Amino acid sequence: MAGVLCPTEEDRSSRAALRMLPPQPCPDESGAYRRMSGPTLSQVQEEPAAEPPQPPASAAEDDVRKRGYLRKQKHGHKRYFVLRSQSHLGPARLEYYDNEKKFRSGQRSGCHPKRVIPLYLCFTVSRRADAKNKHLVALYTKDEYFAMAAENEQEQDGWYQALSELINESKGACLDTEELEENYGTLRPGTVFKEVWQVNVKPRGLGQAKNLSGVYRLCLSSKAVHLVKLNSDVACVHLLLMNIRRCGHSENYFFIEVGRSSSTGAGELWMQVDDCVVAQHMHETFLDTMKALKAYSEFRPRSKSQSSCTNPISFITTRRYLGNLPPSQTGLQRRARTESMVGTPPSAKNNSFRFRTSSEGEGTMTRPFRSVTGSLSHLNTARINLGKQEGAGRYVRAPFNSGYQSRSASLPVSHFPSATSPISVCSSSGHGSASETLTRPSSSSVCGSPSDGGFISSDEYGSSPGDLRYFRVRSNTPDSLGNTPPIQEENTLSDYMSMSTHSQPDSRDDYMEADKCFRKRTYSLTKHTNSASKQKSQTAISLGEDSEEINKQFAFAESPKLKDSSLVDDYSNGVIDSVCNQSRSKASDDGYMPMMPSNLYDSDYLPMAPKTVSAPKQINRCPSQADSKGYMMMFPINSSPVKNVFGGAATKSNLEKLSNGGYMDMSYGNSTKQIHDSNLNNNSRGLSSYFSLPRSFKSLTKQTTDQNEYVPMSSPGKLLHLGAENGVDVCKDGAVHDIAKIELKSSSSILDQQVKRPNKLTLGIRGSNTIPRMFDHSAPAEPTSPGEYINIDFSDKASSTPYSLSADGSPSSLGSSCDHRQSPLSDYMSVDIDVQSPKATAEQSNSLTDISLYACTVVSRMQPNAEYAKLPCGTACVSKTDNIMDDYTTMTFNMAMTPPRSFASETENGTKVDSPSSIVNRLCIGELTSLNSGFSLPNPLPEPIAGPKVIRADSQGRRRHSSETFASSSTVTTSSSCFTESGKRHSSASFDNVWLKPDENSCEQENKMSRHCSTGFQNGLNYISLSMHNGVCEPTSPDCHQHQNGSRNLESGGYVSIDFTRCDCLKCPTSRKD
């Protein structure tokens, strides 16, 4: 007997080797499964000729785990099911036969089962119920759903437990849901889910928006839900349970509403199932699973206040970290939109895991920590070993060359170079959880955008900057959210800024000594030593958007720390280029910029140093710009060496000037000598905020030094006669420079630049590139800044020269007063009405003195260069010179019917002085006939286009004050042919360039003003040059100004010139002489 059994045992061993190969089932035409051809069990059984005698039934049934009758769900047919475990006969599988007889006979005769389902291909097994069957056991594969109905619940549980165990064993290395969610949606065959439903996603809501319609497997795990398409191993939709706002069912439909933090965005998913019982079961299962989230320490129960997704789900924690600055003072670090890494609370599996603070970006910690869904990940190591050398240090700066950028106002930009999609925190009022009594209810939510600035709202903390409440932040990625208190790590804080004031460099904390290698937080300027080390700043000061020439030019200012190591390192300037490398050998930086007045160079005050319009070059630092009280003076700008508009090259003095153009020049006096005055730093600059008051310039206009740096709004023409009497230099050292070399350079020297409408006001005295000129070689450039002040200055001092621009006049006679006040830098519109000498009074009584076209006298002007027009007006109603100042005049248009009234005022000498309002009482548009023959420029410019031109200023500019508007009278009629409808090309005239060219010797037209000439007469003329004459000048009149180089070539770019004459058309006395 033994000899017979031995060969049988050897044969069984060889067949067992073939049976170990897993069978590969495939459906046939009828939908049933059959064995595929190959070296499998089916091939052995299909060769009965070579089949040895069958073993006993006990030997064939040793791998059967469970067997019995069950009904099929679809048709209710009863079948005999056999559950086999993995053995030498084959892998774990579920088979069913027509009946038990066929099963037993098949073991002897080799009868095939009706169907074989390998368990390693199954997703999971679940217990279900529907309208027909209350006890269902369902198996799910990637392409099929198979369910069996049991007779009772005990039988259902028995099959469910047996199938679950075999499915777990058949997978080999069992994958839990946490490992699955680490791969973020990647499914492996045999993955076990808590529940799986086969649903039909309807094209409604997210199904239509995300193209998710069709048959899917809805796989539910303990923390997430997946939508897996048939015959696919990868979940196309991965949703966290905490992102689900609500769920429900309606008849045979089940729907899920997710929030905006989900991977699909906010919306609803509608799924159709077999019947309403299945939908109800799905609803109940989802609710039970979501309630079970509170078992996990990183989640908290959802409340009604959080169901609308206005507040993020916070972590349950009672840990408080005292002594930390809130993120409102340090800014929120920006990170990539796709970054989904967040830590679990301290009660998690690994004690090294911790919260992620709101001030940490990607690249904060070097340790791995598990995400909400259990994913293990490593962050960047940009800040490795930060602060370890500082035992008791309070703050740590970002290391140099670590890819960091920063904003000057403690607004960090990014903590890693690859951050291309910053986030911004938008806070809204909301309600937090009542279970957290130590923290303020937080309602901030993070909404990312590739273009936002990444700034944080500070309403999370209350009014105190030292509030110790921490900040809750929620990312827009599904698995990255948290309640984030600041955390001390290695006894220090990362990237927090000290808000304490240090006025002296030696009063810094000791921890700052170890921070010398770290980078400054504010924009400090150094010499341009290495262009490769510069980084482009997002908050760099930019010029006008349309200025093509200026955008090509940059400025580099020398940091004060390069000159003196005792200076504070945070002395900062804003320039076009970004931060350069700082000198590490100098005093270290405390990172704080005090906003209080302090001593010179002893504070971190931010001086708004102007930038240049010249080519990039290294320049010396301008002298001290702050007085003893700590206020920074708006120092006068000196233009860069640009090409002279009149053909001459720039002088040497211009080359040596500080090229700081571009910032608003608020300086007073002649700035030419500020470079050449060796005692300039020793001069007192004791100005205070008093001089920023509106009428405080009156005390400054009588001084002759350039120490007072407020702009007096006096006539630019007053300085004209100083060129002959006092010289062009107003500095104390008395050095004289040639007028033609210094003052002939007007702002029209940038005619070749296509200056358009920038975003800020620039009032440079020389080299200005923002002020248009009427007399360009090309078309007039658009004005750029809405100037809105009109200066009307009165002076009662007697003039030593008459005010006529006659042929034998000299440049020195082009003044308006004898007080020799310095001219401001590029005044706006100045109407200067002075008292004439008795000689002039006798010659012309109770009439307007001639007000000439002083905007054309660029050669003779010492300080201004015809940046804006001026109107020096001399009054003739004075019988004796006195010292009474009348500081206001009334400019009234079209008062021809009103006789002049004499407003006599007694001086201390008994002399009556008529009020200027009685003198300047009737103004009308006159004729631009001729100019002074004594003035000629080297290169006469071509005549501009004759015709009105109204140029609108920037719509974002300030609105004009009501006192700055000239109201047009209703009696004004249209007369001049040059006032056409072309003046309507701009709806509002903030800058009015009006050029009148009526017919010569036309006395009737010049006395009338066109109603349609410009809307500026109704809405306010902001920049206008009024050249007033006291009579109709005929070409043969001796007092008339003859054309020499053209009536427009003398103006180097002032605004429009309008001749005003008396409405009674009085002619100039021919007897007036110099």
UniProtKB/Swiss-Prot annotation:
<dbReference type="InterPro" id="IPR001849">
    <property type="entry name" value="PH_domain"/>
</dbReference>
<feature type="domain" description="PH">
    <location>
        <begin position="63"/>
        <end position="168"/>
    </location>
</feature>
<dbReference type="InterPro" id="IPR039011">
    <property type="entry name" value="IRS"/>
</dbReference>
<dbReference type="Pfam" id="PF02174">
    <property type="entry name" value="IRS"/>
</dbReference>
<dbReference type="GO" id="GO:0043231">
    <property type="term" value="C:intracellular membrane-bounded organelle"/>
</dbReference>
<keyword id="KW-0677">Repeat</keyword>
<dbReference type="GO" id="GO:0008286">
    <property type="term" value="P:insulin receptor signaling pathway"/>
</dbReference>
<keyword id="KW-0807">Transducer</keyword>
<feature type="compositionally biased region" description="Low complexity">
    <location>
        <begin position="804"/>
        <end position="817"/>
    </location>
</feature>
<feature type="domain" description="IRS-type PTB">
    <location>
        <begin position="193"/>
        <end position="297"/>
    </location>
</feature>
<dbReference type="InterPro" id="IPR011993">
    <property type="entry name" value="PH-like_dom_sf"/>
</dbReference>
<feature type="compositionally biased region" description="Polar residues">
    <location>
        <begin position="475"/>
        <end position="504"/>
    </location>
</feature>
<dbReference type="InterPro" id="IPR002404">
    <property type="entry name" value="IRS_PTB"/>
</dbReference>
<feature type="short sequence motif" description="YXXM motif 6">
    <location>
        <begin position="631"/>
        <end position="634"/>
    </location>
</feature>
<dbReference type="GO" id="GO:0005634">
    <property type="term" value="C:nucleus"/>
</dbReference>
<dbReference type="GO" id="GO:0005737">
    <property type="term" value="C:cytoplasm"/>
</dbReference>
<feature type="short sequence motif" description="YXXM motif 8">
    <location>
        <begin position="710"/>
        <end position="713"/>
    </location>
</feature>
<feature type="short sequence motif" description="YXXM motif 3">
    <location>
        <begin position="496"/>
        <end position="499"/>
    </location>
</feature>
<feature type="region of interest" description="Disordered">
    <location>
        <begin position="426"/>
        <end position="461"/>
    </location>
</feature>
<feature type="compositionally biased region" description="Polar residues">
    <location>
        <begin position="347"/>
        <end position="361"/>
    </location>
</feature>
<feature type="short sequence motif" description="YXXM motif 5">
    <location>
        <begin position="605"/>
        <end position="608"/>
    </location>
</feature>
<dbReference type="GO" id="GO:0043548">
    <property type="term" value="F:phosphatidylinositol 3-kinase binding"/>
</dbReference>
<comment type="function">
    <text>Potentiates insulin signaling.</text>
</comment>
<feature type="region of interest" description="Disordered">
    <location>
        <begin position="1"/>
        <end position="64"/>
    </location>
</feature>
<feature type="region of interest" description="Disordered">
    <location>
        <begin position="801"/>
        <end position="821"/>
    </location>
</feature>
<feature type="region of interest" description="Disordered">
    <location>
        <begin position="475"/>
        <end position="510"/>
    </location>
</feature>
<feature type="compositionally biased region" description="Low complexity">
    <location>
        <begin position="426"/>
        <end position="435"/>
    </location>
</feature>
<keyword id="KW-0597">Phosphoprotein</keyword>
<feature type="region of interest" description="Disordered">
    <location>
        <begin position="326"/>
        <end position="370"/>
    </location>
</feature>
<feature type="short sequence motif" description="YXXM motif 1">
    <location>
        <begin position="33"/>
        <end position="36"/>
    </location>
</feature>
<dbReference type="GO" id="GO:0005829">
    <property type="term" value="C:cytosol"/>
</dbReference>
<dbReference type="GO" id="GO:0042169">
    <property type="term" value="F:SH2 domain binding"/>
</dbReference>
<feature type="short sequence motif" description="YXXM motif 4">
    <location>
        <begin position="592"/>
        <end position="595"/>
    </location>
</feature>
<feature type="short sequence motif" description="YXXM motif 7">
    <location>
        <begin position="663"/>
        <end position="666"/>
    </location>
</feature>
<dbReference type="GO" id="GO:0048009">
    <property type="term" value="P:insulin-like growth factor receptor signaling pathway"/>
</dbReference>
<dbReference type="GO" id="GO:0005158">
    <property type="term" value="F:insulin receptor binding"/>
</dbReference>
<feature type="short sequence motif" description="YXXM motif 9">
    <location>
        <begin position="888"/>
        <end position="891"/>
    </location>
</feature>
<dbReference type="GO" id="GO:0005886">
    <property type="term" value="C:plasma membrane"/>
</dbReference>
<dbReference type="GO" id="GO:0005159">
    <property type="term" value="F:insulin-like growth factor receptor binding"/>
</dbReference>
<feature type="compositionally biased region" description="Low complexity">
    <location>
        <begin position="442"/>
        <end position="454"/>
    </location>
</feature>
<protein>
    <recommendedName>
        <fullName>Insulin receptor substrate 2-A</fullName>
    </recommendedName>
</protein>
<feature type="short sequence motif" description="YXXM motif 2">
    <location>
        <begin position="145"/>
        <end position="148"/>
    </location>
</feature>
